């Protein structure tokens, strides 16, 4: 997914409000909910005939059906997005908000691709490894990828650790090719 600079500005501004009100987790859940509502009704929310006020009111009513409320900052944030026709950036804003939230907590985001659902002892080892190099606690975004056969791939702060069978085979074939070229 391509992340835009505009989405970054919206995400940081919304996170600053969330931090000020000590509602970071609540605002993250709100963004996730709004993204899902928007993505399931894109035709309606992208329709220029429907006024921004109506779109925000609709999201507010859906939130209320799920027992949630929208505060004034969330409402103004959505109104701004719809007035400026930036609703297509909602998923990017959500992703960047989540990323910036992790950084604001003095943690490091880490992508974990693993062949199976990770066990707690595996996560503990990976946490220790990342703490050693990043000097921060990791927050994992885990993806199960059965094509990896076994092992895991962890990426954080520009580093990549690949312990998969697939990765080992790839490195082995590259080494073999290098040796073949040198002979």
Curated annotation (Swiss-Prot):
Q: Which superkingdom heads the taxonomic lineage of this protein's source?
A: Bacteria
Q: What is its main location?
A: membrane
Q: Which GO terms describe its cellular component?
A: plasma membrane; proton-transporting ATP synthase complex
GO MF terms held by the record = proton-transporting ATP synthase activity, rotational mechanism
Task: Print the keywords alphabetically.
Answer: ATP synthesis, Cell inner membrane, Cell membrane, CF(1), Hydrogen ion transport, Ion transport, Membrane, Transport
**Key word Transport present:** yes
Q: How does it sit in the membrane?
A: Peripheral membrane protein
**Pfam families the UniProt entry points to:** OSCP (PF00213)
* InterPro entries registered for this protein in UniProt: ATP_synth_OSCP/delta_N_sf, ATPase_OSCP/dsu
Protein's cellular compartments: Cell inner membrane
Relate the assembly described in the record. Answer: F-type ATPases have 2 components, F(1) - the catalytic core - and F(0) - the membrane proton channel. F(1) has five subunits: alpha(3), beta(3), gamma(1), delta(1), epsilon(1). F(0) has three main subunits: a(1), b(2) and c(10-14). The alpha and beta chains form an alternating ring which encloses part of the gamma chain. F(1) is attached to F(0) by a central stalk formed by the gamma and epsilon chains, while a peripheral stalk is formed by the delta and b chains.
Summary of the function given for this chain in its UniProt record: F(1)F(0) ATP synthase produces ATP from ADP in the presence of a proton or sodium gradient. F-type ATPases consist of two structural domains, F(1) containing the extramembraneous catalytic core and F(0) containing the membrane proton channel, linked together by a central stalk and a peripheral stalk. During catalysis, ATP synthesis in the catalytic domain of F(1) is coupled via a rotary mechanism of the central stalk subunits to proton translocation. This protein is part of the stalk that links CF(0) to CF(1). It either transmits conformational changes from CF(0) to CF(1) or is implicated in proton conduction.
Protein family according to the UniProt entry: Belongs to the ATPase delta chain family.
What name has this protein been given in UniProt? ATP synthase subunit delta
